[in-house]
UniProtKB/Swiss-Prot annotation:
Reactions this protein catalyses: H2 + NADP(+) = NADPH + H(+); H2 + NAD(+) = NADH + H(+)
Compartments, as annotated in UniProt: Cytoplasm
Enzyme type, top EC level: oxidoreductase
One GO location term (cellular component): cytoplasm
Domain of life of the native organism: Archaea
Cofactor binding comment, as recorded: Binds 1 nickel ion per subunit.
Summary of the function given for this chain in its UniProt record: Part of a bifunctional enzyme complex that functions as a hydrogen-evolving hydrogenase with sulfur-reducing activity. May play a role in hydrogen cycling during fermentative growth. Activity exhibited with NAD in addition to NADPH. The alpha and delta subunits form the hydrogenase component that catalyzes the reduction of protons to evolve hydrogen.
Thermal dependence of catalysis: Optimum temperature is greater than 90 degrees Celsius. Activity increases with increasing temperature from 30 degrees Celsius to 90 degrees Celsius. Has a half-life of 6 hours at 95 degrees Celsius.
Needed co-factor(s): Ni(2+); Fe cation
This protein's encoding gene: shyA
The protein's name in its UniProt record: Sulfhydrogenase 2 subunit alpha
GO molecular function: ferredoxin hydrogenase activity; hydrogen dehydrogenase (NADP+) activity; hydrogen dehydrogenase activity; nickel cation binding
């Protein structure tokens, strides 16, 4: 017998799952990423390196900054492009803006209805309208940062190898800093709400993140420093996304692995919240990825004013994007809101000849299946099929999957 979750709701993209029942016992769980492959690597082949980040920004509207930054970092390594410190800090600001936008969308509009027992955020408005309004306000602020640095709210084209097409003014940055301070109280409230959520899903034993908080030159897996090609990618016949394993174990990426592997990097009230809820987070239940996102949202709002002050006090040096070689190979590691994102290029005479991208949801797919399997085993026979399906979707949503991103890498 197969119990089908016909379509995941309140997630980005199209996916479904099957729970396999044999002789009255739960035997398997399969997550089917059914959204069609998009072949973004193919689109980059033969393209001038300068055009590639703008193409990669089209992979996802929600996390285009991460794709753009990972792309330019890979190109800069391949072609020996120097990047001023102020450019790096403006990119960091853009990434925090994206985390603010994406986490607000997920927490307030997609995951919060699960906490309060509603089918969707619209149904919450009569009793929890202020929370919905706060979430939309925070999301709009994150988009304002993305528009300022990336050029557009979605699919921006301002992030370039070595720098930017347009640089923000001092007045624009100061406005962003002040606005961020006014939103901290909202994020503080949402942390407490998600701390009350019931644990569930599999335990993510193999945690993976970039070596620095938002990017790095290598990955950290349970404290061990590795390169992405040491993680095995395995195609599966029922899904357009591969499974990822490290030494035979599924990996887990996202806000929870970031906080557990690199939580010493955060400061302020978010750091105190991290310590207060550390026991929950260290249980590594995937459901607490929501709590981790809430803490990270708080930190992002605290970090933005600090970062703006650093940028303005040091001054903005504009990068020129000058290359030192026309051929080379580079890997860009960036933390997208949902976890580790990899862009890898080989460039010859200024043209991309080989391209590979791995997204957070692709890394997480196998652990998502194991989480559904564990939860189905716990609930089958004691809950109605309808209630079990609802709970399984709660587990899926905790991963905050971006399914449109996950299918782009299937190759012809």
């Amino acid at each position: 017998m197969i119990i089908e979750l016909d379509e995941f709701t309140r997630v980005e993209g199209n996916g479904k799952a099957e729970i396999v029942i044999e002789n009255g016992e739960v035997k398997d769980a399969r997550v089917k990423i059914v959204e069609g492959p998009r072949f973004f690597e193919i689109l980059t082949l033969g393209r001038d390196y300068w055009d590639v980040p703008d193409l990669e920004a089209r992979i996802c509207a929600i996390c285009y900054i991460a794709h753009s930054v990972a792309s330019v970092r890979a190109i800069e390594k391949a072609l020996g492009i120097d990047v001023p410190e102020s450019v790096e800090k403006l990119r960091e600001l853009a990434l925090w803006g994206e985390i603010i936008e994406s986490h607000a969308l997920h927490l307030y509009l997609l995951a919060l209805p699960d906490v309060f027992g509603y089918p969707d955020a619209i149904s919450m408005i009569p009793r929890h309208g202020e929370l919905v309004k706060e979430g939309l306000t925070i999301k709009a602020f994150g988009n304002a940062i993305r528009e300022l640095i990336g050029g557009r709210e979605i699919h921006g084209i301002n992030i370039k190898p070595g720098g930017f097409g347009r640089y923000p003014s001092e007045e624009e940055l100061e406005k962003i800093a002040e606005h961020s301070k006014s939103l901290i109280k909202f994020a503080r409230r949402i942390v407490g709400i998600f701390a009350s959520q019931e644990a569930g899903g599999a335990v993510g034993e193999v945690l993976m993140a970039t070596s620095d908080y938002l990017w790095g030159d290598e990955l950290i897996i349970n404290g061990e420093r590795v390169q992405y090609y040491e993680v095995d990618e395995v195609p599966v016949g029922y899904s357009f996304a591969k499974h990822s394993y490290y030494k035979g174990n599924p990996v887990f990426v996202g806000a929870l692995p970031r906080l557990l592997l690199k939580g010493e990097s955060i400061e302020g009230e978010a750091a105190r919240m991290l310590e207060e809820y550390r026991d929950k987070l260290e249980s590594k239940y995937v459901i607490y990825n929501n709590l981790a996102q809430a803490i990270e949202l708080l930190y992002a709002l605290e970090r933005v004013p600090q970062l703006v002050e650093e940028i303005l006090s040091e001054g903005i040096e504009r990068g020129n994007g000058e290359i030192s070689q026309e051929s080379g190979e580079g890997v860009g590691y960036v933390e997208a809101p949902r976890g580790v994102l990899v862009h890898h290029y080989r460039i010859e005479n200024g043209k991309v000849v080989w391209s590979n991208t791995i997204t957070p949801t692709a890394f997480n797919q196998r652990l998502m299946e194991l989480s559904l399997l564990e939860e189905a085993k716990r609930l089958y026979g004691s809950e109605s099929e309808e209630n079990m399906k609802k709970r399984l979707e709660v587990i899926v949503r905790a991963f905050d999957p971006c399914i449109s991103c996950s299918v782009h890498f299937v190759k012809l």
